[in-house]
Amino acid sequence: MLYLTKIRNAESEFTGNEQKIADFLRANVSELKSVSSRKMAKQLGISQSSIVKFAQKLGAQGFTELRMALIGEYSASREKTNATALHLHSSITSDDSLEVIARKLNREKEQALEQTCALFDYARLQKIIEVISKAPFIQITGLGGSALVGRDLSFKLMKIGYRVACEADTHVQATVSQALKKGDVQIAISYSGSKKEIVLCAEAARKQGATVIAITSLTDSPLRRLAHYTLDTVSGETEWRSSSMSTRTAQNSVTDLLFVGLVQLNDVESLKMIERSSELTQRLK
């Protein structure tokens, strides 16, 4: 689990003391070997229990586990940087050549994939796959780039026999949401988790007794609070990050994993359907 990433993505939710702790950890990550919770509490003017609660909020058992994990993350990051022939800053500028832009985009996407995969709770992911596999009907919602990710997933699921609706029109999305039934699944894809249209559809789905699965960021959001299950994605936000490129990369890694997991549950029949689909489309050429 990448705690530095979790700290960065959860900043908007921190209290005053939690922000002090977060700032201290990031500023002193290279020197954490010699830092105890007592020493840190004294320096920041807060209680030791506040530090322990902060660690637990991030998913660690206590400060010692968080401290050791941060030390490990810092060391791994240093080794990776030293091993890279060309170290590039993540922000793309108007002066960058196409070669430099290509390298930066590639690195940004690599980071999005690495950080997203590091956050996976695989037991929860397996449970989500099982829930989807039993759904009589699946609705996928999303806007903009997230809608493209949803459409890709819908095609894949239809290939292996699932009944799926993935409509771009928000009015149609809302109409489908209110017609869902108990046992149905809604997969809501939204990095911010705050888009009014997606939240409205999730509310309607829950009201109908459907299971809501959110593919979203770590930040607390209306969608995250509505969802029965969440799958976390991480992506770097920069001024030049147009078209949500790294966000789509992270989201696609999640949806591809869901698809492969569903294929594995019924591999023989799924592979037969994929083959039949391929044979049929070949006849259209």
From Swiss-Prot:
HAMAP family with a match to the protein in the record: HTH_type_MurR
Name of the protein in question: HTH-type transcriptional regulator MurR
SIS domain location: 128-268
InterPro entries: Homeodomain-like_sf (IPR009057), HTH_RpiR (IPR000281), RpiR-like (IPR047640), RpiR-like_SIS (IPR035472), SIS_dom (IPR001347), SIS_dom_sf (IPR046348), Tscrpt_reg_HTH_MurR (IPR022821), WH-like_DNA-bd_sf (IPR036388)
MF-aspect GO terms: carbohydrate derivative binding; DNA binding; DNA-binding transcription factor activity
GO-annotated biological processes: carbohydrate derivative metabolic process; N-acetylmuramic acid catabolic process; negative regulation of DNA-templated transcription; regulation of carbohydrate catabolic process
Domain HTH rpiR-type: 1-77
Complexes and interactors: Homotetramer.
PANTHER family listed in its UniProt record: GLUCOKINASE, HTH-TYPE TRANSCRIPTIONAL REGULATOR MURR
Source organism of the structure: Escherichia coli (strain SMS-3-5 / SECEC)
Signal peptide location: none
Annotated region of DNA binding: 37-56
Keywords: Carbohydrate metabolism, DNA-binding, Repressor, Transcription, Transcription regulation
SUPFAM superfamilies membership: Homeodomain-like (SSF46689), SIS domain (SSF53697)
Record gene name: murR
Protein purpose: Represses the expression of the murPQ operon involved in the uptake and degradation of N-acetylmuramic acid (MurNAc). Binds to two adjacent inverted repeats within the operator region. MurNAc 6-phosphate, the substrate of MurQ, is the specific inducer that weakens binding of MurR to the operator.
